[in-house]
Design a protein with these regions (language model features):
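Glycine-rich, basic loop-to-helix element that forms the pyrophosphate-binding segment
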Residues: 124, 138-154
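Short, acidic, metal-binding catalytic loop of nucleotide-sugar glycosyltransferases
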Residues: 100-109
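Conserved donor NDP-sugar-binding/catalytic core segment of glycosyltransferases
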Residues: 171-208
C-alpha cells in the first residue's frame, strides 16, 4: 500500500493529517523554520492522525535536536544566479513536473536549460516549449554528454544539475548556491527525498537510501576525504559546480553514467576530480529535491545493478588511469560493507534492503572495468558534434 508523504513545520502547531483509505504508513519531512532537520517514519499510521498523535510519534521515533529552545536559523541569503541544467531523455511527464517546480527560480534571475539527450521523438521539445527556458539538443547518447552540453552553454558562473524526475524545493537554488561565498568551495550537493512511495519497489529503494543521507552540513576536502571515496559527498541528482572549475577539469567523463555501458558514476568521478584539484565540496540539507524513485521491481534491479557497474568503472578509472592506490583499497573494502550491514540489520530486526537486491549491485560491480573499456573503445569511434544553438 502507498505511504503518505507529508511536510511538517515544527515551529508552528502541527496539522491534522488524513491518510487516504488506500494509504498505510507516514513518511514526513520535519522542518524548523523552513530548514529540513529530520524525518518521521511511521509504518503503522492509518486514517486520521491528530496533532497530538503526530507529536507523540515525532517524540518517540525521530532523532532531532532540542528544537523548542533553538532560535530560528538565519534566512538563506540571496546569492549569485545559477544556470540550472536538466538533462532528459524521453520522460515528458517527469520533465513537466520538474520544470514546473523551476518556474519560480527562473523568475528569480536563475537561468534554466533543458538538454534533450539523443531524442527519439518530439515529446521532450513539446514539453520544453511550454516554459520560458532554453532548449538544447545533445545528439550523443549519454548523461555526461548532456551535462557537458549544458555546461558549455551556461551563461552564469555557477551551474546546478537536477534530475528530470525530481522536483525542486522552493529554497533549493539559494541553498545550493550559498556555500559558494567561500572561494574554497568548488562543488555543492544537497538532500534527496522521495517524491512518492507508491510501490513496493519505491519502498525498497528508500531503504537503500536511508543510511546514505544526513541532516547535518558536511564539508569534504582531500586528503581527509580520499578522492576515490568521493561518492560520500552527494548525488548528481542534486549538485552545483563552479563552471570555470568544471571546464578546467575537462567537464564530465562521457564514458560514465546513464546512457552508456557503465550506467552510472559520472557524478562521483566529477566529485573526485574536484577534490583532486584541492577544492572543497559542501553538502547542505537545506538544498532539497524530491525524487521519484523507480516504480517497478525491474527498474529497481536495473538501477542497483547499474550502481555497481558505475562504482567499479569509476574505481577502475582511478586505479588504472590515475594510479590511485586508494581506489583498490576502497574497492576491496566495499564488498564487505553494504551486504554485511544489511545482514546485521536483519539480525537485529531493523529495516534493511533485501540481500537479493544488494546482490544486484554486487553483480554489477564485476562488470565495471570491462564496461569502462568497452565504452572507451565505443566513444573513440564517435565523432558527432553537439548542437548547442
Amino acid at each position: 500500500m502507498p505511504t503518505h508523504i507529508a511536510d511538517l513545520e515544527l515551529s508552528t502547531p502541527l496539522p491534522t493529517l488524513t491518510l487516504q483509505s488506500h494509504e498505510r504508513g507516514l513518511f514526513a519531512l520535519l522542518r524548523w523554520h523552513g530548514r529540513p532537520v529530520g524525518l518521521l517514519r511511521w509504518p503503522q499510521a492509518t486514517g486520521t492522525l491528530t496533532p497530538a498523535q503526530v507529536q507523540a510519534a515525532i517524540t518517540a521515533s525521530a532523532q532531532l535536536p532540542a528544537l523548542p529552545s533553538a532560535p530560528a536559523p538565519a534566512p538563506i541569503s540571496a546569492t549569485a544566479p545559477l544556470s540550472i541544467i536538466i538533462c532528459t531523455h524521453e520522460r515528458p511527464d517527469d520533465l513537466q513536473r520538474c520544470l514546473t517546480s523551476l518556474l519560480p527560480l527562473h523568475a528569480a534571475r536563475h537561468e534554466v536549460l533543458v538538454v534533450d539527450n539523443a531524442p527519439r521523438t518530439e515529446r521532450t521539445v513539446t514539453v520544453a516549449r511550454q516554459f520560458p527556458f532554453r532548449y538544447l539538443v545533445e545528439p550523443r547518447q549519454g548523461l555526461d554528454h548532456a551535462r557537458n552540453c549544458g555546461l558549455h552553454a551556461a551563461q552564469h558562473a555557477l551551474v546546478a544539475y537536477i534530475d528530470d524526475d525530481a522536483v525542486a524545493d522552493p529554497a533549493w537554488a539559494a541553498a545550493l548556491a550559498a556555500p559558494f561565498t567561500d572561494p574554497a568551495v568548488g562543488c555543492t550537493t544537497g538532500l534527496v527525498l522521495p517524491l512518492e512511495l507508491a510501490t513496493a519497489a519505491q519502498e525498497r529503494f528508500e531503504l537503500y537510501c536511508t543510511n546514505r543521507r544526513t541532516f547535518q552540513l558536511k564539508r569534504y576536502r582531500a586528503p581527509q576525504t580520499p578522492p576515490a571515496a568521493a561518492g560520500v559527498a552527494g548525488m548528481g541528482a542534486n549538485m552545483a559546480l563552479r563552471r570555470d572549475l568544471a571546464l578546467t577539469l575537462g567537464g564530465f567523463d562521457p564514458r560514465l553514467d546513464a546512457g552508456t555501458a557503465t550506467q552510472s558514476g559520472g557524478d562521483t568521478d566529477m566529485f573526485a576530480r574536484v577534490l583532486d584539484h584541492g577544492a572543497t565540496i559542501v553538502y547542505t540539507p537545506d538544498a532539497l529535491v524530491w525524487h521519484r524513485h523507480r516504480r517497478s521491481e525491474a527498474e529497481l534491479r536495473h538501477c542497483l545493478f547499474g550502481y555497481g557497474v558505475g562504482l567499479y568503472a569509476f574505481l577502475s578509472k582511478r586505479l588504472l588511469e590515475q594510479r590511485d592506490p586508494q581506489a583498490l583499497m576502497i574497492g576491496v573494502r566495499w564488498w564487505g560493507g553494504p551486504i554485511a550491514k544489511a545482514a546485521w540489520a536483519k539480525l537485529r530486526g531493523q529495516p534493511a534492503l533485501p540481500l537479493e537486491l544488494l546482490a544486484q549491485e554486487a553483480a554489477g560491480a564485476w562488470f565495471g572495468a570491462l564496461r569502462l573499456a568497452q565504452e572507451t573503445r565505443r566513444q573513440a569511434r564517435t565523432t558527432v558534434v553537439p548542437n548547442t544553438n
